[in-house]
Amino acid sequence: ADDKNPLEECFREDDYEEFLEIAKNGLKKTSNPKHIVYPVKPSEQLYEESLRDQLPTSMHRYPSMIQKIFFAGEYTANAHGWIDSTIK
C-alpha cells in the first residue's frame, strides 16, 4: 500500500517555491498583464483545495496538466497546446 501523504508530496515539487512566492506577493505590475494558470496533479488536489480561497481570482487551476506555472499564451508540450489567453 502507498502510504505517502499527498499533501506532503506537494511540497516536494520543483516549482513549489516559485508558486508560493507568486501566491503570496502577486505578479510584478506590467503594462501588459497576463493571466496565470496553475495546473495541479490529481495527487495535489488536497493542497490545491486548501489554497483556493487564498488565490487571486485571475489564477486558474487545470487538474490534468503537468505541475508548472503557465502564462496566458504560453505554449505547452502537453495535449492542451497553447494556454488560452482569453481566460477571465
Swiss-Prot record:
N-glycosylated. It is found in: Secreted. GO terms for molecular function: L-glutamate oxidase activity; L-phenylalaine oxidase activity; toxin activity. Substrate binds at residues 81-82. Keywords: Antibiotic, Antimicrobial, Apoptosis, Cytolysis, Disulfide bond, FAD, Flavoprotein, Glycoprotein, Hemolysis, Hemostasis impairing toxin, Oxidoreductase, Platelet aggregation inhibiting toxin, Secreted, Toxin. GO terms for biological process: apoptotic process; defense response to bacterium; killing of cells of another organism. FAD binds at residues 74, 81-86. Its cofactor is FAD. Expressed by the venom gland. One of its GO terms (cellular component) is extracellular region. Signal peptide: none annotated. It catalyses: an L-alpha-amino acid + O2 + H2O = a 2-oxocarboxylate + H2O2 + NH4(+); L-leucine + O2 + H2O = 4-methyl-2-oxopentanoate + H2O2 + NH4(+); L-phenylalanine + O2 + H2O = 3-phenylpyruvate + H2O2 + NH4(+); L-tryptophan + O2 + H2O = indole-3-pyruvate + H2O2 + NH4(+). Its EC number is 1.4.3.2. Catalyzes an oxidative deamination of predominantly hydrophobic and aromatic L-amino acids, thus producing hydrogen peroxide that may contribute to the diverse toxic effects of this enzyme. Is highly active on L-Met, L-Leu, L-Phe, L-Ile, and L-Arg, moderately active on L-His, L-Trp, L-Asn, L-Glu, and L-Val, and weakly or not active on L-Gln, L-Lys, L-Asp, L-Ala, L-Tyr, L-Ser, L-Pro, L-Gly, L-Thr, and L-Cys. Exhibits diverse biological activities, such as hemorrhage, hemolysis, edema, apoptosis of vascular endothelial cells or tumor cell lines, antibacterial and antiparasitic activities. Belongs to the flavin monoamine oxidase family. FIG1 subfamily. Homodimer; non-covalently linked. This is L-amino-acid oxidase. It comes from Vipera berus berus (Common viper).
